[in-house]
């Protein structure tokens, strides 16, 4: 046989050994427990995680984000549109899907630099509360609401989503759930 045949036999034998080995079954259970433990995201840890990622110099983010500082989930409905247009289209698409109107209250969980919340208020007249754990994003979002004359319609709060107690007509969260963990 060839070297390739030998490596295939070794690989199959190793996989069989792993599947039947008591030691590796225990190892797998311990490994899964450790993975689960690392995914527990207590509020204090959430704040640290968000800060270490988003409380960096915003100039860095401006190098690769769209002009509205949208972080994820751009909607490229065709290949010929720019990142700015794709992010704008994403916000419009979400607002349309949620059927938001001016009589509604909306919660934006993980609001980032405020782009989604501000767009909702501009397009619909709804009252929007955006929450974030990032101090830099919070300051920028507040400044943007003031500059755009939307501070009567949009409120930004430095808060964990688990502390929110109000009732809303709609809740939106774009690209935040990867930070949630298991708790």
Where are the regions that the model predicts?
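A short acidic, Gly/Pro-enriched loop at the edge of an enzyme's catalytic core
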Residues: 162-171
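Conserved class I S-adenosyl-L-methionine
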Residues: 102-110
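Conserved SAM-binding motif I beta-strand of class I
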Residues: 127-132
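Conserved SAM-binding loop
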Residues: 141-142
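A conserved beta-strand element that flanks and buttresses the S-adenosyl-L-methionine
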Residues: 172-177
């Amino acid at each position: 046989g060839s070297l390739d045949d030998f490596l295939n036999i070794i690989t199959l034998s190793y996989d069989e050994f792993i599947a039947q080995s008591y030691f590796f079954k225990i190892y797998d259970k311990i490994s899964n427990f450790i993975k689960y433990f690392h995914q527990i995201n207590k509020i204090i840890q959430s704040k640290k995680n968000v800060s270490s990622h988003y409380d960096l110099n915003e100039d860095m983010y401006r190098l690769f984000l769209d002009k509205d500082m949208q972080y994820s989930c751009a909607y490229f409905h065709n290949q010929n549109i720019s990142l700015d247009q794709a992010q704008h289209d994403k916000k419009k698409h979400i607002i349309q899907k949620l059927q938001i109107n001016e009589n509604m209250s909306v919660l934006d969980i993980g609001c980032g630099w405020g782009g989604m919340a501000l767009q909702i208020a501009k397009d619909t007249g709804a009252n929007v509360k955006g929450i974030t754990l990032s101090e830099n994003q919070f300051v920028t979002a507040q400044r943007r609401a003031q500059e755009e004359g939307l501070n009567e319609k949009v409120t930004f709060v430095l808060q964990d989503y688990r502390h929110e107690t109000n009732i809303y007509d709609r809740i939106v969260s774009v690209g935040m759930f990867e930070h949630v963990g298991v708790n």
